[in-house]
C-alpha cells in the first residue's frame, strides 16, 4: 500500500503539470496501465444516466464516441449504483460494454478481470474508471483500499477539470449546474479542430440575445447546433420551436409563422398561435431560411426589427420575446447578390454566423461518430455489442461523405440491420460488405441508372404508370445532381418544396 501511494504521489505532480484537461486525463490512464498492468482502462463522465468516455487507454478510438446507457449495460449500472469499488468475477455472465473494443483482443471478452471505480464528490456520482485485464487473476492481489485511493484522486481531478471548464466557458451564466446546460440531448460529437472551434463559438454566443445564422451543407447537423445554443442559454427552460421553411407551402407560411384569428380565411375555425408566439421567451429555429419567399422575408424582417407580430386577419400587434436561430445550406450573400434574399434580413440574421464543417473535413471525427451511432443502434436492436471491423474503420476514414453525418448515421444503422440478419448471435461485427461507400453517390440514395433499369418505360403500360416512372426518374436525377439536397432539387424542378416532398412520398422515393 505504501509503495503504491508513493508512486501516485509522485505521479500527481505530472498530472498537475499537464497543460490541458485532456492531457491530464490521458496521463491518469497511462499511469493506471503502468501501475496496475491492465490491458485497458477508461475514464467516464456520468450525466443523463449515461457514461460518456472522456479518455481511453487500450480501447478502440470509436469508444470515445459512444454514450453508454446504464439501463442497457448492467456492468456499468452496477458501478453507478454501488457507491464503492466493484469487482466483477472472472466468470461473470454480465455482458461487457467493451466486447470487441479492446485493441489487442478481437471478439467477445470471455473470462477476464474487470474492476469499476465510481468517482464520487460529496456522495454524488460524477464519473467512473473501468479497468480490464485479459488475465483473470491480474487484480487478485490489489487491495480495495488501494483502489479507493486511486478513485479519490481521479474524482478530485475530474471535479476540478469540470469546474475549470465551467469557469472558462460559462462565466456569464447564472449559478445553475453547468451539467444541466450541456447534456447528452444537445451534445455535439467531435474532437477535430473545426468542431472545437465551433463549440467555443457556441459557448460564446449561447447566453447572449444575438441572432445566429448556422451555415453548412445538408446533413452536417445544423439543427443540433441550434439545439445546443438554446440549451446553453438562459432561455433553456422555455420552448425551442422548430420550423422547416423548405417544407412550408406558401399558402400557409404566414399563418405558420405569425398565427391567425378565427375566420381569417377558409378553414380558420379558431384562433391559433404561430411559431413566434409558441417560442415566446424561448428560441425559434428557422431551418432552411433561404427558402422563404421575398414577401415572407419582409414580414419576418419587421418582426425582428420591432419585436412584435400580427396574426393573419388581426389588426393588433402582439409583443414577443423570441430569439432567432436560422440555418441554411445556401450561400446567402450570393443569394442576396442574385436578388433572391433580402440584404437587410441577411444582416439581421447573421449577427453571429456559425459554420458547421462538412464531415470530409473532420476525418478524425468519423470513427467517433461511427461509434456513437453503433451504440445507438445496438440499443435499438437489443444487441449485446456492435463493433466495427478494422477494414471497415479504414474505409470509413477514406470515404468523402457527400451526405455528411446524416449519411454516416444511415449507413451504420443499415449495416447493423444486415449484420443482425446474418447471425443469431447477440454480438455482431459490421464489415465492409455491409456498406456501399465506394462511389460518390450516397448509399441510401438510388442512382439514376438503377432507377432507369427498374422503371424503363414501355408502350404497353398505362399513362399514369408511365408518368409516375418518368417523374420518379426526374426527381432522382435532380436529387443526385444536388447531392440529396431537397430544397435545391425543388428549385431545379421549379416545384414548391412542400409539393415535392409529398410527391416523393407518393412515388416511394421517401
From Swiss-Prot:
Residues 486-505 bind DNA. Pfam families: GAF, Sigma54_activat. GO terms for molecular function: ATP binding; ATP hydrolysis activity; DNA binding; DNA-binding transcription factor activity. GO terms for biological process: phosphorelay signal transduction system. PROSITE patterns: SIGMA54_INTERACT_1, SIGMA54_INTERACT_2, SIGMA54_INTERACT_3, SIGMA54_INTERACT_4. It comes from the Bacteria. Signal peptide: none annotated. Pathway: Nitrogen metabolism; nitric oxide reduction. Keywords: ATP-binding, DNA-binding, Nucleotide-binding, Transcription, Transcription regulation. ATP binds at residues 216-223, 279-288. Residues 188-417 form the Sigma-54 factor interaction domain. Required for the expression of anaerobic nitric oxide (NO) reductase, acts as a transcriptional activator for at least the norVW operon. Activation also requires sigma-54. This is Anaerobic nitric oxide reductase transcription regulator NorR. It comes from Vibrio vulnificus (strain YJ016).
Amino acid at each position: 500500500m505504501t509503495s503504491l501511494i508513493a508512486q501516485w504521489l509522485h505521479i500527481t505532480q505530472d498530472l498537475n503539470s499537464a497543460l490541458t484537461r485532456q492531457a491530464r486525463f490521458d496521463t491518469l490512464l497511462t499511469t493506471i496501465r503502468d501501475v496496475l498492468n491492465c490491458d485497458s482502462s477508461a475514464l467516464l463522465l456520468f450525466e443523463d444516466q449515461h457514461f460518456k468516455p472522456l479518455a481511453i487507454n487500450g480501447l478502440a478510438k470509436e469508444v470515445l464516441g459512444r454514450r453508454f446507457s446504464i439501463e442497457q449495460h448492467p456492468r456499468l449500472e452496477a458501478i453507478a449504483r454501488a457507491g464503492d469499488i466493484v469487482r466483477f468475477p472472472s466468470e461473470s455472465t454480465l455482458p461487457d460494454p467493451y466486447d470487441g473494443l479492446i485493441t489487442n483482443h478481437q471478439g467477445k471478452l470471455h473470462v477476464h478481470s474487470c474492476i469499476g471505480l465510481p468517482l464520487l464528490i460529496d456522495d454524488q456520482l460524477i464519473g467512473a474508471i473501468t479497468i480490464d485485464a485479459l488475465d483473470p487473476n491480474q487484480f487478485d492481489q490489489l487491495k480495495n483500499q488501494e483502489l479507493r485511493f486511486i478513485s479519490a484522486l481521479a474524482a478530485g481531478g475530474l471535479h476540478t477539470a469540470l469546474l475549470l471548464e465551467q469557469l472558462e466557458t460559462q462565466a456569464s451564466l447564472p449559478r445553475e449546474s453547468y451539467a444541466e446546460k450541456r447534456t447528452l440531448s444537445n451534445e455535439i460529437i467531435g474532437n477535430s479542430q473545426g468542431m472545437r472551434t465551433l463549440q467555443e463559438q457556441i459557448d460564446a454566443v449561447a447566453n447572449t440575445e444575438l441572432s445566429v445564422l448556422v451555415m453548412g451543407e445538408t446533413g452536417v447537423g445544423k439543427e443540433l447546433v441550434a439545439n445546443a445554443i438554446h440549451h446553453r442559454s438562459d432561455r433553456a427552460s422555455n420552448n425551442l420551436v422548430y420550423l422547416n421553411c423548405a417544407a412550408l407551402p406558401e399558402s400557409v407560411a404566414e399563418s405558420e409563422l405569425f398565427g391567425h384569428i378565427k375566420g381569417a380565411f377558409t378553414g380558420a375555425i379558431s384562433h391559433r398561435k404561430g411559431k413566434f408566439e409558441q417560442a415566446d421567451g424561448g428560441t425559434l429555429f428557422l431551418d432552411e431560411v433561404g427558402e422563404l419567399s421575398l414577401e415572407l422575408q419582409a414580414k419576418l424582417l419587421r418582426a425582428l426589427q420591432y419585436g412584435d407580430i400580427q396574426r393573419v386577419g388581426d389588426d393588433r400587434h402582439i409583443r414577443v420575446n423570441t430569439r432567432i436561430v436560422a440555418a441554411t445550406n445556401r450561400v446567402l450573400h450570393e443569394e442576396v447578390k442574385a436578388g433572391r434574399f433580402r440584404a437587410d434580413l441577411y444582416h439581421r440574421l447573421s449577427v453571429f454566423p456559425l459554420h458547421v464543417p462538412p464531415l470530409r473535413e473532420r476525418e478524425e471525427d468519423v470513427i467517433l461518430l461511427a461509434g456513437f451511432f453503433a451504440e445507438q443502434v445496438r440499443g435499438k436492436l437489443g444487441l449485446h455489442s456492435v463493433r466495427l471491423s478494422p477494414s471497415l474503420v479504414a474505409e470509413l476514414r477514406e470515404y468523402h461523405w457527400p451526405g455528411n453525418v446524416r449519411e454516416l448515421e444511415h449507413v451504420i444503422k443499415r449495416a447493423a440491420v444486415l449484420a443482425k440478419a446474418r447471425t443469431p448471435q447477440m454480438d455482431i461485427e459490421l464489415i465492409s460488405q455491409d456498406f456501399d461507400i465506394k462511389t460518390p453517390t450516397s448509399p441510401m440514395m438510388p442512382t439514376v441508372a438503377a432507377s432507369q433499369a427498374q422503371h424503363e418505360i414501355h408502350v404497353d403500360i398505362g399513362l399514369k404508370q408511365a408518368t409516375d416512372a418518368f417523374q420518379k426518374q426526374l426527381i432522382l436525377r435532380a436529387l443526385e445532381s444536388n447531392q440529396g439536397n431537397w430544397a435545391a432539387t425543388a428549385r431545379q424542378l421549379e416545384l414548391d418544396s412542400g409539393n415535392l416532398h409529398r410527391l416523393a412520398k407518393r412515388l416511394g422515393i421517401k
